[in-house]
Amino acid sequence: VGAPLAETPENADVLLLPGGGDVHPRFYGRAIGGAVDIDEARDERELALVDEFLREGKSVVGICRGLQLINVLFGGTLHRHILGHAQVCGRDRLHVVHTAPGLLHALYGARFTVNSAHHQAVEALGEGLQVLACAPDGTVEAIAHKSLPVFAVQWHPERLCGAFARSDAVDGAKLLSALLRQSKKSKEFLKKC
């Protein structure tokens, strides 16, 4: 995130937007109420990076906050505070998601369990985005752009693999491997998610 904008797309195949604090509500036309741990400078840098990568035709992948930021970039809005999805006593919650046909369905099936550690979520979906997975309460859990190489999940696959793997949730390594392997091979891959 701290690399010069002009150099970043040239030196990378994929931009990964990780989790973190809340997206500042000013970026989607709202007042601060309910948002916490805001870093406006980070928001501005990451929004600019996404724009740079997309202009170069490169892939953008978001995790948690990354999904929220992508939604905002395309004109969507966020619920500033939802209940039932944040960590409890420092531990991720678990819940089921339901998927539409596509990458997630191919990897994990129509219904599977993921972790949850967020309190912001998609409210209005950004232009050109489509929902790929939802929680039972309707919370958007995965999105992709209809024509650009953009894909994002609300959960943390990096906290569901390796030493952090859980027997009661999906293997996050399957998703991360598929995204990174395929996005390096083809700019068209993420358009098909």
What are these regions (language model features)?
Residues V1-I63, V72-L73, H79, L83-Y108, ...:
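N-terminal beta1-alpha1 cap of cysteine-dependent amidohydrolase-like domains
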Residues L67-L69:
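Hydrophobic, aromatic-enriched interface-forming segments
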